[in-house]
Amino acid sequence: YGATVDLVDTTKVGRNERVAQLAEEMPDAYFASAYDDRFVIEGNATIGDELAGRNFDAIITPVGGGGLISGIVTGLCRNGSRTEVYGAEPLLGNDAARSLKAGRIIVNETEPMTIADGARTISLGKLNWEIIKDSVADILEVSDEKIAEAVRMYFGLANLKSEPTGAL
């Protein structure tokens, strides 16, 4: 298919900086953020579509840049669901929780070094924030110790092999 894989050592260069470099090298390419992209949000909204018919009291979902949670909320809302949605993010990278409390996007100074590597984002995406700020009940902050405990618990009780971000 002609794809090129570009492995980025994030200890030497940030993801966003490398993407900016690649965008200059390939001006005709489409950059799809892993979270702050309308197509990504809409894809994740299909999860909310499916959950809407289940009549849950609440849903808790991991938060990094906000693509998953904003998509789920979008799907739930367009189906008329009143299910409350909560986010869970690493305490070491709690920009989403701080943003929700402050009423504006808070940016981490550096990429958080948490075991939940799928949530190592500097901040929520702008598109995601517009959805999250009015639709998410709360964002829970989880220590790396509790995340590791959850990974072990999933395996011990249900033989589920979860990566740390999924265990949030």
Outline where the language-model segments fall.
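PLP-dependent amino-acid enzyme catalytic core
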Residues: 1-168
